Every structure is written in structure tokens, then in C-alpha cells.
């Protein structure tokens, strides 16, 4: 079970940075609005199939995600680093995304979901450099 503090951090934010890699090993990143499915522990976002990151996810589903609180106050630094597997989203994922972003209901959406295999939360509000780690293998 994912620590509540990790879940709460993910739920409080709405933009992630998605990292993918090309077939020849070249990294790429893209910012995406996301919704979090707590029940399935998945991050849901949209991406047109023509985008570079979507094309790369089709070739290699292993991705990384970063979500960060922007602050200059060291004692408030928080962020997650996530490794996971991307897949095409389903109708239920679409409903979760539209609930978070109602204006998206009128747009054609290519839904994606990432199932985390590893999450690390750095949270200086718990103590300088304090990290909480979740691993799907444990």
C-alpha cells in the first residue's frame, strides 16, 4: 500500500513531467496534466498519438515521472520521482480524467495511464532530505 503522504502529494498536484526514451536511447520529456486514480494507483493523462512521447511509449512502455512543488524555501521542498509502465487508458480512466478536468469532455482524448513500480517522495517538511519510498515488489 502506498504511504498516505505520497498519495496526498500526488493528489494535490495536476502537472507531471513525463520522461520517455527513443529507440536509439535519446531521452525526452513532456509536461502533462494528470488525474490520479487512487484505487488502481495510476496516473492518467492525455497525449495525442502524433507526439514524440506517445510514439516512444508505444515502442517502450517504461517511463519516469517527476512531480515537484515549486518553492525557493528549502524547508518546503517536496517532489516525487516515479518509475512505471505506460499503457493505453480505458473508459474508466477517461471518466477519472474528465472528473478532474471537466473542460476536457468536449475534446477528443487519447488517454494514457502509468502504473508506478517505484515512487520516491522527498519531503523536507518531514525533515531535511527526508525520503519515503514505495516499491511494487515489496
What are the residue ranges of the model-derived segments?
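Short acidic (Asp/Glu) patches
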Residues: 47-51, 64-69, 92-103
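Residue-level signature for short turns and capping positions that connect secondary-structure elements
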Residues: 23, 50, 70, 119, ...
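Short beta-strand segments
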Residues: 14-49, 57, 63-68
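Alpha-helix boundary recognition
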Residues: 10-11, 58-59, 98
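Helix-adjacent hinge/juxtasegments
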Residues: 53-84
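Charged, gly/pro-rich active-site loop segments
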Residues: 74-138
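Extreme N-terminal tail/first-helix region
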Residues: 1-17
